[in-house]
Amino acid sequence: ADYIIAHNEKMKKWLEDNGCKAKLGVLGIFDYLSETSAAPKQNTEKPYSVLYAGALSPRKNAFLYEVGAFVHSFSLNLYGNGFEINQAKGKEHFNYMGFVKSDDLIATAQGDFGLVWDGTSVSTCTGDFGEYLQYNNPHKTSLYIRCQLPVIIWNKAALADFVRENGIGICVDSLEELEKILNTLSEEEYAEMKKRTAKIGERLSQGYFVRKALQ
């Protein structure tokens, strides 16, 4: 190939370190084209709620069955197939919304943050799916941003830098920290994050990042 677009700087470095000689560009984040727009939301009040969309089975994301033990004041809204709620710790903190198509989710998402996490553990992202977060750009991150949801993401994920630099969410080492972090986040800080997220969401809807990578 004459030119390869890596998902992000971490993936670009991995390709270079592993012998890729092609010219490399960087995408930054996946655009997310959809005719649907996020519904305007009233002012957010505490306690915050966290949305997770994706595979919900214990095999793919066992962390979902452990995280409830560390939740006290906020709630988790789960979208997807295969959640076995009776196996989950702290199941009273979960709202299982079932499967919703992405375009519909943009317009109807219930939550204040979108969670990007994978694997078996709440204390770090483990296993093949979890470790891959160090190199890839999960589509769900872009989906959350189109829903105008600031992102909660693993600190070592490749996209954590993008989240930090753009002020569109929170980077955490462990989900065990989430209760304390959400309790101390002011409504003004959240409103600023949400405003920045909406701005990036606008870019995602226009194919901004692909166009930039091709320049």
What are these regions (language model features)?
Residues A107-C147, I153-D161:
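Nucleotide-sugar-dependent
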Residues A6, I153-W154, V172:
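Short beta-strand scaffold positions
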Residues D173-E176, K180, E187-Q215:
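A charged, aromatic-enriched C-terminal amphipathic alpha-helix characteristic of glycosyltransferases
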Residues F30-A107:
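Conserved catalytic-core segment of nucleotide-activated headgroup transferases in glycan assembly
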Residues K10, I29-F30:
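Carbohydrate-associated surface elements
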